[in-house]
Amino acid sequence: NVPVARQFVLLEAAALAVTGTLSLYADGFRIKWPNDIYYKDRKISGTLSECNIGSNGITQCIIGIGININQQMFTSDAPNPISLAQILGAESDRKEILDQLIYSMEQYLRKVSEGQFDDIHTLYQQKLYRANGRHRYRDNNGEFRAEIENIKPNGHMILKREDGTLSEYAFKEVTFI
C-alpha cells in the first residue's frame, strides 16, 4: 500500500517509465513537473491519473499515458507538440514501444511495492526539465524568474526566486513560461 502522503510516487514511477522507454530511442527526454515528458522544449507525452484513497492509503490508481509516437502533424491547440517520428525522422513500432513501456512500468511499480519511494523520488528529480538555472514562471501574482529548489515527496514544487524567497506550489498553481 502507498500512503496517501506519498501518492505522488506513482506519478514519478510513470514518468520515469516513459522517459526510460523513450530514451531507448533517443537522448534528451526530461520530466516537466509534475508529469509531462519533454524533448528539448517540446512536449511528447502527458499523463493523467486518478487515485482512490482508503483508510490504509491508496487502494487503486488509474494512470493514463499518452505518447506522440508517429504523428507528423498536430491539429490540436497544444503549443509545442513533438513526436518520436519527428525526432527520429522515421516511424516506430507502437507495439514494441508499448511492450517496453509496460515492462518499465512493472519495474518501477515493483520498486513502489517494495517501498523504494526515496530511490524513485531521487531518480525523478534527476530527470527534471529545467532543473538547472533560473527560468520564467507565472503564478496568481504574476510572472517571475526562479529555479527549482526541490520537489517534495507530496509532489509540491519549491521554487527559489531571484531574491532568495522560497515558494511552494501544488499542481496547477504555477505555470512554466
Regions found by a protein language model. Name each.
Residues P3-A5, E12-F29, Y39-I177:
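Long, positively charged amphipathic alpha-helical accessory segments at protein N-termini or as interdomain linkers
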Residues I31-W33:
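Short loop/edge segments at beta-strand edges and connector loops
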